[in-house]
Regions:
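The conserved acidic donor/metal-binding loop of glycosyltransferases
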Residues: 70-74
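Conserved nucleotide-sugar donor-binding catalytic segment
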Residues: 59, 99, 117-202, 207
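Membrane-interface aromatic/basic loop that binds lipid-linked glycans or pyrophosphate carriers
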Residues: 236-295
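Short aromatic/hydrophobic "clamp" motif used to bind/position activated sugar donors
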Residues: 66
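Conserved donor NDP-sugar-binding/catalytic core segment of glycosyltransferases
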Residues: 79-113
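Acidic donor-binding segment of Leloir-type glycosyltransferases
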Residues: 1-43
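Glycine-rich, basic loop-to-helix element that forms the pyrophosphate-binding segment
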Residues: 41-61, 83
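Short alpha-helix within the catalytic core of nucleotide-sugar-dependent glycosyltransferases
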Residues: 22-26, 63, 76-89
């Protein structure tokens, strides 16, 4: 349990689990009725396309801040919430705060450092929307605390997909984020996980679809750049063929923002050489969009 100087509530949505989870939740609900506030579903809602947090959790959240911890993951520091809330209380221009974490590979019983650690940054790192658009990623769901004021349900329901990338894009439109250097949680990797069960090609396709969902609402250069940062990564040719219609739609978006010549060259690099866009090229495109916006 977390040790904090402030009260908190734990909002749980049990999506018709059948593995004994409900019994465990009920046990803790009886012990801490003022803290544990569950919803028990008789039928799985996620499989029906229901956006769980938007429908069941965000509307009933009363706190000034919201933190995530999905059922597969866990926190390891008892002062995690206190540290993050203290930071946000003293830095009003930040809308979210994350921290470092470790990976638990359940099949092997192995715990490793995260895939993309912060190097030589003992004081942590600030990040913004531009960082996210360029492919930066300094958070897992279990590590994030954010201000409840950044939640606008009417805005979020416009997006057809409701995954991490969409939420963080919306949050970072409204302010900066900060990643603490402290390791305060563990992300579980296992075959039954929604994300970790996908192979690399499917993960990249899923991310690409999420970015298109953002563009369908935003229709800005920034949203197109967010597509580009994912689109430029190598992906299996078979996957491209299978998702042909999706790639056609994305190609039209990129041509509208960056020109047919550039997109054609990128397609040739992808299909013939399986190359991705280099960092300097991406920065040049980002700078072009910024100057176009200023004009």
């Amino acid at each position: 349990m977390q040790k904090t100087k402030f009260p908190f509530e734990i909002l749980i949505h049990d999506d018709a689990s059948t593995d004994g989870t409900q019994e465990i939740i009920r046990e803790y609900e009886q012990k801490y009725p003022d803290i544990i506030k569950p919803i028990y579903q008789a039928e799985n809602q996620y499989s029906k396309g229901i956006k769980i947090n938007l429908t069941y959790n965000f509307p009933r959240a009363k706190g000034k801040y919201i933190a995530f911890c999905e059922g597969d993951d866990y926190w390891t520091a008892p002062d995690k919430l206190q540290k993050q809330v203290d930071f946000l209380e003293s830095h009003l221009d930040y809308v979210m705060c994350s921290h470092r974490y470790r990976l638990y590979f359940q099949k092997e019983g192995r715990i490793d450092d995260e895939i993309r650690p912060i190097e030589n940054l003992s004081d942590g790192k600030e990040f913004d929307l531009s960082f996210l658009i360029r492919g930066g990623w300094l958070f897992q769901t279990l590590s994030v605390v954010f201000r409840r004021t950044v939640i606008d349900l009417n805005e979020l329901f416009k997006y057809t997909m409701q995954i991490d990338a969409v939420l963080y894009y919306v949050f970072l439109k409204k302010g900066k984020g900060y990643c603490m250097p402290d390791v305060m949680g563990v992300y579980r990797v296992h075959d039954a996980g929604v994300w970790s069960s996908l192979n690399l090609n499917h993960q990249r396709m899923f991310s690409l679809k999420a970015r298109k969902a953002i563009y369908d609402v935003e229709k800005t250069d920034e949203a197109a750049l967010f597509i580009l940062s994912q689109f430029s990564r190598p992906m299996g040719r078979i996957q491209v063929i299978r998702e042909y219609s999706m790639f056609v739609r994305i190609t039209k978006i990129l041509i509208a923002h960056f020109g047919a010549g550039f997109v054609l060259r990128m397609w040739i690099d992808r299909l013939l050489f399986n190359k991705k866009l280099c960092v300097n090229e991406f920065y040049q495109i980002e700078d072009f969009c910024r100057r176009k916006k200023i004009r």
